[in-house]
């Protein structure tokens, strides 16, 4: 594989990384739970996003419960929502940094097609930060508020794949002569 093709492939990987990060950031399925309450046939599941939670009632996705609104109330029952809101806000900020770093890496690689260590470093940093964002969100997200059967949702997996693509793109760019 020639060096030019490797560079374009690396740029494509970073573009895919950024697309998945944006899709993951604005999606509503970072955590999912099917079969909320076995005693109530109307509740079918829930989806937790970075900034809100959705509950499926009678097969329809209900109105979102925004963490910031629930956190603003003085009711102690909503206190775990403050942790979820903080985790979502922190993760969103990290993902915006990933988008900025990845965009700068793409711009530098197109303006200066020569192999530079700065572009490789920026591409790798975008991938590592995308993975770190998922890890930060998972550790900050309140674990006691939701049931044990909750699993990572599609948007969390997309962000993980985005991080892997960012790291692989940096490696591919480094290998180009």
Locate predicted features.
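Signature of small four-pass
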Residues: 3-28, 88-138, 159-174
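Long, glycine/tryptophan/cysteine-rich extracytoplasmic
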Residues: 26-86, 141-150
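Alpha-helix initiation/capping motif
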Residues: 49, 116, 153-154
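Individual transmembrane alpha-helices with interfacial aromatic-anchor signatures
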Residues: 148-161
């Amino acid at each position: 594989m020639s060096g030019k093709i490797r560079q374009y492939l690396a740029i494509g990987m970073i573009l895919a990384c950024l697309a998945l990060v944006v899709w993951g950031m604005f999606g509503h399925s970072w955590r999912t739970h099917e079969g909320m309450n076995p005693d109530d046939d109307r509740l079918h599941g829930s989806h937790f996003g970075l900034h809100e939670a959705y509950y499926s009632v009678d097969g329809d996705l209900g109105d979102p419960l925004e963490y910031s609104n629930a956190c603003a109330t003085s009711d102690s029952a909503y206190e775990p929502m403050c942790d979820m809101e903080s985790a979502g806000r922190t993760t969103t900020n990290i993902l915006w940094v990933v988008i900025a770093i990845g965009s700068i890496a793409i711009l530098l690689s197109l303006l200066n097609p020569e192999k530079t260590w700065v572009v490789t470093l920026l591409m790798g940093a975008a991938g590592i930060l995308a993975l770190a964002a998922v890890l930060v969100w998972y550790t900050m997200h309140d674990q006691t508020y939701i049931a044990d059967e909750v699993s990572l949702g599609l948007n969390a997996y997309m962000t993980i794949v985005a991080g892997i693509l960012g790291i692989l793109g940096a490696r591919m760019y480094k290998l180009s002569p």
